[in-house]
């Protein structure tokens, strides 16, 4: 990896990155939007869409009403500003001072697939190295006998939001920065 050639010492040794495709909405977990409660039921302003087409799921709707989260939010001590979290995460709220919540990610994609590709690789176009590959490249490894990182798939009857291989691949990077898929059933690794 690149870690030995850094011009400064890396602050992180490990990263635990949880991406739950098809999980709860950010609006129901960490992204507190009090204005949505005030605007509940009003139609989505045209300037929010900024001329973008509407997805197929909503194209036949006559209106696009705003709606807040159904869950209560409280502010938790984390830094000078604190972190807002919903009642869905009571146990995480107890350790929020020890984690990093990133609430600034944005994509122009209006559909899940290109948006997920952007979150995982930094580009809406498939084929770029994943976050795991970049972390492997930047941090190096503490053990050459273990994979750079692992990807865990949940066992599900529905695969609408499956984590495609291209979302955790190395793209143009060397294969030693490739993660290993752990299966949820039977043998975790097929060898």
Regions found by a protein language model. Give the residues of each.
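Ligand-binding pockets and gating/stacking loops
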Residues: 1-191
């Amino acid at each position: 990896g690149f870690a030995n050639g850094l011009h400064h010492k890396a602050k992180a040794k490990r990263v635990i990155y949880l991406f739950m495709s098809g999980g709860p909405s950010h609006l129901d977990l960490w992204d507190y939007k009090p204005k949505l409660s005030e605007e509940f039921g009003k139609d989505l302003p045209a300037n929010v869409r900024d001329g973008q087409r509407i997805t197929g799921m909503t194209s036949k709707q006559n209106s696009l009403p705003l709606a807040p989260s159904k869950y209560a939010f409280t502010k938790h001590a984390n830094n000078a500003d604190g972190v807002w979290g919903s009642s869905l995460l009571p146990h995480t709220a107890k350790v929020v001072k020890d984690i990093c919540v990133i609430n600034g990610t944005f994509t122009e994609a209006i559909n899940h697939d290109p948006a997920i590709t952007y979150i995982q690789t930094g580009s809406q176009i498939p084929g770029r190295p994943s976050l795991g590959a970049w972390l492997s490249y930047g941090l190096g490894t503490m053990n050459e006998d273990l994979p750079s990182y692992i990807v865990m798939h949940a066992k599900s009857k529905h695969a609408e939001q499956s984590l495609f291989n291209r979302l955790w691949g190395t793209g143009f990077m060397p294969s030693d920065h490739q993660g290993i898929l752990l299966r949820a059933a039977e043998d975790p690794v097929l060898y």
